């Protein structure tokens, strides 16, 4: 069947979706029975030069026009931010349109409200592109591992930070130089604060934790440290001890079912699979009670990998329209779920001291156990 969709875009991912839907339209039709057509596109600036050709007739700057268009069945939100995006997604759900979004900040901060609205309006939200770019980790948790109690998730889920730490480690660059290189190569934004502060990864961790444990984790219950305090000296000392430094997101439940969610620079043994994830790549280790340990690796950002996830969601949305029902996208099941504050969390620490009399510190022993 013909599925009309609209896009509201601000970044290159939207261009990637437009390009790749056109390029692989026949393949998608053969595999899914859905003929995807992007019928309207809302942008902030009509005059802006675009890397792909979009017919001027389908362009507008007013997304409300698109939500009001009865021929449109699916709305794709790729504008980022939380205020206007919240209005757009809410209006689309109220207009009974399926929503596809790649907006992790929006879901982390307003997810509980939006999924309740989706449930009330009887239309789903799809959000594969919100976490880890092209890695289909949302589908894994919602479908592939649905029979498992999730014991823990450990992930490198911010490509900017991983690129910076990799260059510091492998090329000996300072933090500032590595970040500048990441910006020049397009791995980091002009304002990289959200990435380097750890909050981009934390937003993704909130989504993964909420899916895994069935209740929405509040942002204030998440412990976040960025890589902006990591120096080349930290990395060199860690290497002498046999560790690599990664910005790691950790999600796990204790014996009482309290869920800890944190993102911080972490020492990983150099033999650990996550210690060997380099550059802008992402990787996520999910531990389930039935399946055991599983690993997912791939590009966590970029136009094509992220558009792959958006188009996957468009196909799922099309299947919902053609074949019928699906839940809102989030099924609450941890009705008594509680977060675990960082001050009750037990973990090992790395402390680097500058001492004036090394002899008096020789009785200190160095940690040799795994630090996660």
Regions found by a protein language model. Give the residues of each.
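Conserved small/polar residues in nucleotide/adenosyl-binding loops
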Residues: 2-11, 362-368
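Rossmann-fold NAD(P)-binding glycine/threonine-rich loop
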Residues: 104-125
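Rossmann-like NAD(P)H-binding beta-loop-alpha module
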Residues: 122, 126-188, 195, 199-200
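Substrate-binding/catalytic subdomain of NAD(P)-dependent oxidoreductase enzymes
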Residues: 177-276, 281-283
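C-terminal catalytic subdomain
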Residues: 287-325
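A conserved regulatory-domain signal marking ACT and ACT-like small-molecule sensing domains
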Residues: 309, 314-370
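ADP-ribose/adenylate-binding Rossmann-like module
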Residues: 93-109
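N-terminal glycine-/serine-/threonine-rich beta1-alpha1-beta2 phosphate-ribose binding loop
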Residues: 5-6, 10-94
């Amino acid at each position: 069947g013909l599925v009309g969709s609209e896009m509201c875009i601000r970044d290159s991912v939207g261009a990637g979706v437009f390009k790749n839907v056109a390029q692989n339209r026949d393949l998608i039709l053969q595999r899914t029975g859905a003929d995807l057509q992007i019928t309207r596109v809302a942008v902030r600036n009509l005059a802006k030069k675009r890397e792909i050709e979009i017919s001027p007739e389908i362009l507008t700057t007013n997304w409300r026009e698109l939500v009001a268009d009865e021929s449109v069945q699916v709305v794709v939100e790729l504008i980022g931010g939380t205020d206007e995006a919240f209005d757009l997604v809410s209006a689309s759900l109220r207009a009974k349109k399926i929503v596809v979004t790649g907006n992790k900040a929006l879901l982390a901060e307003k997810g509980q409200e939006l999924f309740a609205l989706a449930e009330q309006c009887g239309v789903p939200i799809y959000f594969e592109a919100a976490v880890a770019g092209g890695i289909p980790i949302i589908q894994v948790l919602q479908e592939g591992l649905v029979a498992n109690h999730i014991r823990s998730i450990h992930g490198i889920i911010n490509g900017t930070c991983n690129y910076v730490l990799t260059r510091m480690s492998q090329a000996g660059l300072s933090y500032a130089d590595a970040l500048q290189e990441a910006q020049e190569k397009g791995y980091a934004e002009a304002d990289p604060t959200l990435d380097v502060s750890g909050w981009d990864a934390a937003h993704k961790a909130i989504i993964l934790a909420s899916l895994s444990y069935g209740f929405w984790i509040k942002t204030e219950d998440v412990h976040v440290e960025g890589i902006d305090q990591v120096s080349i000296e930290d990395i060199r000392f860690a290497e002498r001890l046999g560790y690599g430094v990664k910005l790691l997101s950790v999600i796990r439940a204790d014996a009482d079912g309290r869920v800890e969610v944190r993102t911080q620079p972490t020492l990983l043994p150099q033999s650990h699979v996550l210690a060997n994830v380099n550059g802008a790549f992402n990787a996520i280790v999910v531990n389930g009670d039935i399946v055991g340990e599983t690993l997912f690796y791939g590009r966590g950002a970029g136009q094509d990998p992220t558009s792959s996830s958006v188009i996957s969601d468009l196909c799922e949305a099309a299947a919902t329209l053609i074949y019928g029902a699906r839940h809102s996208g989030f099924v609450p099941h941890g009705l008594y779920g509680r977060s675990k504050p960082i001050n009750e969390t037990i973990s090992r620490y790395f402390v680097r001291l500058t001492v004036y009399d090394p002899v008096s510190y020789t009785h200190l022993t160095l940690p040799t156990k795994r630090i996660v």
